[in-house]
Amino acid sequence: CLVGSEMCIRDRADTIVDDDSFDQADFLRKVAAYPECPKSACPSPEVYQRGFEADAEHLYAVTLSAELSGSYNSAELGKSLTLEEHPDKKIHVFNSKSASIGETLIALKIQECEEAGMEFEQVVETVDAYIESQHTYFVLENLETLRKNGRLSRVKALVASALKVKPVMGATPEGTICQLDQARGINKALVKMVDYVKEGENNSSDKILAISHCNCPERAQMVKEALLERMQVKDVIILDTAGVSSMYANDGGIIVAM
């Protein structure tokens, strides 16, 4: 059983829960309208604890990278609270060391292992190895969220915007964000990202290509086609970004994981 716990996004006027009711278009309008950046809040340990009380033999949670969010530590505490009352439960919290579509791929890997009839410990070992082999890349159209969060100075954001410089970003093995490259214009940045994806995958035919996009399905399709021209994959998934991913990717952002 995969335990779901929704993060919240708060701005001056609203609290938005990142769940199935999330309205991406409405959220993007609100983000564009407010000068201040919305803030995200991870689920409390008690929220995870309630999820871990599900009647299932094996329980798993997949969290946003521990280097980017308090979700992993919160889930681990929720696990400890649950095991105090139910010491026989089998629970594992996976630190995705990724975000967005990367977490989706990990959840699918867990499902695959469970459907194959693996023992709990074997599932954990297999999925941990999968996480270590996974790569995440992204390109942002809009740098305003990074600027509003204090991760990019106003001057740098304005210069980047004026010069149409788009960073090509990735996740480190530890789950932090790094800049891999940059390019003048979004299309050139996406081409560079495709290059990095191709160079980073040796056995792509056994992997799922996963792409999430923030309000730019045509751009996601273009990235998919560019990658499939250069590599074979087992399957392709394209999804809209959810709440927290939309907050950081911002309108026009593209995330790729394999």
Which positions does each model-derived feature cover?
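Single conserved hydrophobic/aromatic residue that forms the stacking wall/gate
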Residues: 1-4, 8-9
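Class I S-adenosyl-L-methionine
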Residues: 14-75, 80-84
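Short glycine-rich or small-residue beta-strand-to-loop segments that form or flank ligand, phosphate
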Residues: 58-65, 92-95, 109, 208-212
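Active-site histidine-anchored catalytic micro-motif
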Residues: 70-136
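Internal, active-site/partner-interface "lid" segment
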Residues: 112-179
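Gly/His-enriched, cation/cofactor- and phosphate-binding structural elements
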Residues: 176-258
